[in-house]
Amino acid sequence: MKRPDYRTLQALDAVIRERGFERAAQKLCITQSAVSQRIKQLENLFGQPLLVRTVPPRPTEQGQKLLALLHQVELLEEEWLGNDTGIDTPLLLSLAVNADSLATWLLPALKPVLTDSPIRLNLQVEDETRTQERLRRGEVVGAVSIQPQPLPSCLVDQLGALDYLFVASKGFAERYFPNGVTRSALLKAPAVAFDHLDDMHQAFLQQNFDLSPGSVPCHIVNSSEAFVQLARQGTTCCMIPHLQIEKELASGELIDLTPGLFQRRMLFWHRFAPESRMMRKVTDALLEHGRQVLRQD
């Protein structure tokens, strides 16, 4: 049975996390040549490449499995050592989350764990359609995703759904939709997307107004909170979670442009199996808060 040296695995992990050999060497306080040698030792042990040497480097499928193993072992080891010695060593938990969850329900959900447990969070923000890939690559130990199916050796639970409304300010609606939201009016109304892979706005318009992708002027802004600000100041129409703008809707600062029409995103919590005690606390906190604030039907 091939048993990797965890020191060499940490070199592979550092190259992925630091996005290159030079920064990985600095992180590990060794030479760049030593990093390369450790990874070569791993590749010789398993008889195949573990790293695709692109910019930035990325792990192969076997490399992903080894990184996932490393993170599981590190989490269990740190937790066990802390509990056994009485030293509250903060556990590093790397989680992949979508920006809208981070801006709405996720941090309140984690408050009990952050208050009562010695952990350090590394929250990696990614679109909910792609967070599971970070778990697959071994970059994180848990992920909030829209994918219902678990990866091999992983667990999954349904969290609940975010409902996205098509909203804008009253002034924006009067300017761009004086006769209501029509197909022709939408072609001139500026919108916003999180990045070039964010297709929620386009999917909503295609489904309800038969508008093809790319037909609507669209800003790219990598901030969930900025969506709200852009809508409030009357410069764009946006797809925003109802949970994020309850006050603005109640006050009339923002209006629902298409009452009865919305996009629903069901969210799922993925993590490696078996769960450590600390990850079980995180899971329980997310599921409990999700049942309270996310749509369950």
Curated annotation (Swiss-Prot):
Task: Tell me the domain of life.
Answer: Bacteria
Q: Which Gene3D superfamilies does the record match to this protein?
A: 3.40.190.290, Winged helix-like DNA-binding domain superfamily/Winged helix DNA-binding domain (1.10.10.10)
Q: Which GO terms describe its molecular function?
A: DNA binding; DNA-binding transcription factor activity
Could you tell me which SUPFAM superfamilies the record lists for this protein? Periplasmic binding protein-like II (SSF53850), Winged helix' DNA-binding domain (SSF46785)
Query: Where are its TM segments located?
Result: none
Q: Which residues form a coiled coil?
A: none
Q: Which CDD domains match?
A: PBP2_IciA_ArgP (cd08428)
Annotated ranges, domain HTH lysR-type: 4-60
Cross-referenced InterPro entries: ArgP (IPR017685), ArgP_gammaproteobact (IPR023490), LTTR (IPR050176), LysR_subst-bd (IPR005119), Tscrpt_reg_HTH_LysR (IPR000847), WH-like_DNA-bd_sf (IPR036388), WH_DNA-bd_sf (IPR036390)
Keywords of this entry: DNA-binding, Transcription, Transcription regulation
Regions recorded as binding DNA:
21-40
Transcription regulation listed as a keyword: yes
As for family, the record states: Belongs to the LysR transcriptional regulatory family.
Q: Which NCBIfam families match?
A: argP (TIGR03298), PRK03635.1 (NF002964), PRK13348.1 (NF009888)
Q: State the function annotated in the UniProt record.
A: Controls the transcription of genes involved in arginine and lysine metabolism.
Q: How does it assemble?
A: Homodimer.
Q: What is this protein identified as?
A: HTH-type transcriptional regulator ArgP
- Lineage, highest ranks first: Bacteria, Pseudomonadati, Pseudomonadota, Gammaproteobacteria, Enterobacterales
Q: Which gene encodes it?
A: argP
